[in-house]
Amino acid sequence: MAQIDVDVFTAKVLSHWDWSREDRSFGDSASSPESESFDSACSSPDARSSPTAGCEHAEQQKPKVKMSMRRRMKASEREKLRMRSLAEALHQLRDYLPPGYSRRGQPLTKIQTLKYTIQYIKELSGILEQQ
């Protein structure tokens, strides 16, 4: 293994090392850095043919920062509220559309609601222009 390959591998191993734990174990598992092969440390399948190809890409990416449980819960709640608000707005749009736009009592999909609303507004605009 060339010196640069060892340096890249060492940097990769150290970036995954869990420095917060007392026993200084590697990552979340009980495996040691020695059990991690060079090929598996590189994310690209090209790593086997060119040892530095996969690691160069991995070196450029920043490691994912774990979101705290509280932040995830807040983000999830915000997303739920956003989706509820969107569903409410679409429901209101459906109420303004004439019954002829709905299919046999089935609710329109989101995209159908938007397309039919655009079509209906164009029709109303055309009527107003004629007057």
Curated annotation (Swiss-Prot):
Record bears the keyword Membrane: no
Biased composition (Low complexity): 27-45
Keywords, sorted A to Z: Developmental protein, Differentiation, DNA-binding, Nucleus, Transcription, Transcription regulation
Predominant cellular place of this UniProt entry's protein: nucleus
Alphabetized InterPro entries for the sequence: bHLH_dom, HLH_DNA-bd_sf, Mesogenin/MesP
Keyword check for DNA-binding: yes
GO terms for MF: DNA-binding transcription factor activity, RNA polymerase II-specific; protein dimerization activity; RNA polymerase II cis-regulatory region sequence-specific DNA binding
Subcellular location: Nucleus
Pfam families: HLH
Job of this protein: Involved in specifying the paraxial, but not dorsal, mesoderm. May regulate the expression of T-box transcription factors required for mesoderm formation and differentiation.
Protein name: Mesogenin-1
Organism listed in the record: Danio rerio
Gene from which this protein is expressed: msgn1
